[in-house]
Amino acid sequence: MLLINCDLGERGIAHQTDDKLVKYIDIANIACGGHAGSKDSANYYVDLCIKNNIKITAHISYPDKENFGRKVIEIEDEILLRSFDEQFALFDGIHAVKPHGALYNELNKNAILAKLFVGWCISSNINELVTSPFGVLAQYAKSQGITILRESFVERGYMLDDNANPMIIPRGMPNAEIDSVDKAMKQFEQLNNGFIDVGGTKVAFISDTICIHSDSSIALELAQALRFL
C-alpha cells in the first residue's frame, strides 16, 4: 500500500486536527518558517512524530508567508538559498525534504531552479526528496544520487500537462480539490493500482506515497479511512 504523507505544523503548536492526523500517517512534512510554522511548532511536531514513529521531511518553501508559499516569487538565488538554510536549520538529523506549494510546482518545470535546489540538497546532506515523478526535479535529483519518493495526491484533481503527464489542477480552477471522502478513496484505488483516470483517459502513474493536505476539509476522515483499509 502507498505510504500516507501529510503536511503538518502549518497552523501552530498543538493544532487539534494536526495532532490527530499523526496517528494515521507514515510521513510528516513539517513546516519550517518559509510559508508557515516556526521553530516552536517545528520542534513540537518533530517530537510528536518521533514518539509516533513517523518519518519526517522538512517542508521547504519560498519565503512567503503572506501568500502561504503558493505564489512564485522573484528572488535572488543567494537570498533563496539562505532562506532554505534558515528553514532547514530548524531540524537536526533530518535528511529528507518535500518542497511546498509554488516551489514544488516550479521545481518540476524549471530546470535551472531544480539544479540550484539539488545542489543545495547535496550540500545540506539531504538524500531523499518527496516530489512528482514526472518533473525535472525528480529526473535531475536521481541523476545526482538522491532518492525520490514518487508522490501523488489523493484529494486533488488531475489534468494532463503539455507532455501528457498527470499534474494537479491549479487551485482556484474547477475540480482542483476533492471534497468527498468517497471520491478521494476511488482516486486512491486507482493510484494504488498504478494509474489515474484523467477526463476519461487512463494514464500510468506509479507512486510511492500519497499526500493529504492537513487543511483539506476531509483530511482527518480520509486519513482514517485509508489507514483502516
Model-predicted regions and their roles:
Residues 64-99:
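Glycine/small-residue-rich loop that forms an oxyanion/phosphate-binding "nest" at active or ligand-binding sites
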Residues 19-23, 42-57, 92:
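Acidic (Asp/Glu)-rich catalytic clusters
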Residues 29-35, 80, 106-107, 124-134:
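Catalytic beta/alpha-barrel core
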Residues 13-18, 36-48, 108-116, 133-144:
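Active-site-adjacent beta->alpha loops and helix N-cap segments on the catalytic face
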Residues 135-192:
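Active-site rim beta-loop-alpha module in soluble metabolic enzymes
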Residues 2-8, 28-30, 56-60, 95-99, ...:
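Hydrophobic faces of well-ordered beta-strands that scaffold small-molecule active sites
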Residues 28-35, 67-81, 111, 163-178:
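Glycine-rich tight-turn/loop motif centered on a GG-T
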Residues 167-229:
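C-terminal alpha-helical cap/extension of soluble enzyme domains
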